[in-house]
Amino acid sequence: MIVSLLAGFMLVFSMIGAISFSPLPIFIKAQIPGSPQGWHAVHVGAMMNGLMAILIGVIARWFVLSDRAAAVVSWGTIVAIWANVCFYVFGMFAPNHGLSLQSNGLGHANLAGAIAFLPAFIGAVTLFAALIVLLLAKPSSTAAS
C-alpha cells in the first residue's frame, strides 16, 4: 500500500508538472518521468495487489496448510506482488508495455520492457503455485467460524 501511496504522489506531480506539497507554498517545476496514465496504473495496480495479499491471507486461514504449503502461498503471493510492481513501473517506460520480450503491435522491445515482462512472468507462475496449493488444501474445521 505504501507503493500505491507513493505512486499516487507521482501521479499528482506528473499531472501538474511540478512537485507540490499543498497547502504548503512549495511548487517546484519538474518533469516527472512517465505519464499520468502510467502512474495511475502503478497507483491502482499496487493498491489492488495489497488487497489481493489481504484476501489471500484471510482465505489461507480457512485451510489446513503444512509449513511448506504455507510458505508456497506466502512467498508465491509476495513474489507476485513485487513482480507486478516491477511490471507496472517499467511497463510505463516500454513502447511494447512490457507485454513481451520482443517487439509487438504496441511498440518495439527495450530493456524496460524486459524488466517489466520477466518479473511479471515469474510472479504469474508463483501466484498460480500459491493458488493451486490453496485449491488442493483441505478446509479447516474452524473455517466457518
Task: List PLM regions with ranges.
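Hydrophobic cores of alpha-helical transmembrane segments in multi-pass integral membrane proteins
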Residues: M1-I16, G38-A60, W75-M92, P119-L136
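Short acidic alpha-helical/loop segments enriched in Asp/Glu that coordinate divalent cations
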Residues: G17-S22, S66-A69
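Membrane-interfacial segments
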Residues: I19, V64, P95-L99, K138-S145
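Perimembrane loop-to-helix junctions flanking transmembrane segments
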Residues: F21-Q37
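Membrane-water interface of alpha-helical transmembrane segments
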Residues: P33-P36, H40, D67-S74, N110-A120
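Cytoplasmic juxtamembrane regions at transmembrane-helix boundaries
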Residues: A60-W82, T142-S145
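Transmembrane alpha-helical segments of integral membrane proteins
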Residues: F87-N104
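Short, membrane-exposed interhelical loops at transmembrane-helix boundaries
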Residues: L99-I115
